[in-house]
Amino acid sequence: MNTNQDNGNQLQRTMKSRHLFMISLGGVIGTGFFLGTGFTINQAGPLGAVLSYLVGGFIMFLTMLCLGELAVAFPVSGSFQTYATKFISPAFGFAFGWLYWLGWAVTCAIEFLSAGQLMQRWFPHIDVWIWCLVFAALMFILNAITTKAFAESEFWFSGIKILIILLFIILGGAAMFGLIDLKGGEQAPFLTHFYEDGLFPNGIKAMLITMITVNFAFQGTELIGVAAGESEDPEKTIPRSIKQTVWRTLVFFVLSIIVIAGMIPWKQAGVVESPFVAVFEQIGIPYAADIMNFVILIALLSVANSGLYASTRILYAMANEGQAFKALGKTNQRGVPMYSLIVTMAVACLSLLTKFAQAETVYMVLLSLAGMSAQVGWITISLSQIMFRRKYIREGGKIEDLKFKTPLYPVLPLIGLTLNTVVLISLAFDPEQRIALYCGVPFMIICYIIYHVVIKKRQQANRQLEL
């Protein structure tokens, strides 16, 4: 399979290890982290929430190990879509590629919509769709200049988020153990909220149900694979970035959950608008709500920035594989696939539908479209690594020649594949998440049909012409 393009249509390898790490964090630390943690604590209880995030982190760890082997062996911009086409089947690669592209393009729309709603706190008289247009234009410019401009902007977006999270963990932890006085002279809670109503107040089953939400919270870390095609020295930068992303993401998430669960009673955690705001207000930090509104706004734009980059590169790679219009596989003089960027942004501008419909209605429809793609992506990564290793050994390849090896093969990849599949199946048992299956499954079936009716026949005809 041809993964290289003509000299005039190539991406540029300008990303360093720090860029890859921040791009991955940019995709994962969003509203699900800043707003969704309270729901997890409320449902699973304090200890149950911590355990849920540890298990979710373990699934992320297994998936990223599989991605590391593939991305080092094949550092291409198509990443797991290219791997799926080559090692699973062209039909699956086609269907998954379009699902994953649509998922991230729609995620951009969701982030623009959420950002517009946040701006109404400060500018209530300006319509949401106007802010959507402003933020869409900003993200388009950052992605259109150069790949390095995108990477640098994402580096600083993610840096702001990390700084706030570190301050939250330090200040919240200090207040939790009485090192900082609480507002109103309240006593430090220490660890009382973890055991005052029992270790699992809603039972083990409640903790298992929250795994669906928790696993989605970690998704976005796989963007390292998409950026591999534009990274300097991928054999060194990708393994380093994967290790940094896995451990630092897990530490940020788990320590934040411990602080929130320690500071806020679990019954109240799902009621407050943002648990981060509630903790900052307990400590007595002025303008806590406005500060977090700004941080969440940055988080939204960061996710949109990473998502626009990822979906553009997936579409670009598919075009060069004959799975999308050929023009989408071209880059400009700066190495930016502009046509793919324009098409992706056109889908992301679905957020502008808020001019004609209620913002909440548009949000739910877009969220259902985006819901399944990332989970299918993790399954695809695990399965592609298993199929790649089998083919590699069958064709006489030596394991010691692989620059990055998934340890304990095939045990860890199979565990990752199984756990990711269980999470996907679990969507059917959650009424709020079930709509993701209703949208995602028919979409993939339609893509399969299109591949066999149109794409496969066209590729066969092209091969015959070449002969």
UniProtKB/Swiss-Prot annotation:
The keyword Membrane applies. GO terms for cellular component: membrane; plasma membrane. This is Amino-acid permease RocE. Putative transport protein involved in arginine degradative pathway. Probably transports arginine or ornithine. One of its GO terms (molecular function) is amino acid transmembrane transporter activity. Its main location: membrane. The keyword Cytoplasm does not apply. Pfam families: AA_permease. It is found in: Cell membrane. The gene is rocE. One of its GO terms (biological process) is amino acid transmembrane transport. It comes from the Bacteria. Keywords: Amino-acid transport, Arginine metabolism, Cell membrane, Membrane, Transmembrane, Transmembrane helix, Transport. Induction: Part of the rocDEF operon. Expression is sigma L dependent, induced by arginine, ornithine or proline. Belongs to the amino acid-polyamine-organocation (APC) superfamily. Amino acid transporter (AAT) (TC 2.A.3.1) family. InterPro entries: AA-permease/SLC12A_dom, Amino_acid_permease_CS. It is a multi-pass membrane protein. The chain crosses the membrane at residues 21-41, 47-67, 87-107, 122-142, 162-182, 207-227, 246-266, 283-303, 336-356, 361-381, 409-429, 435-455.
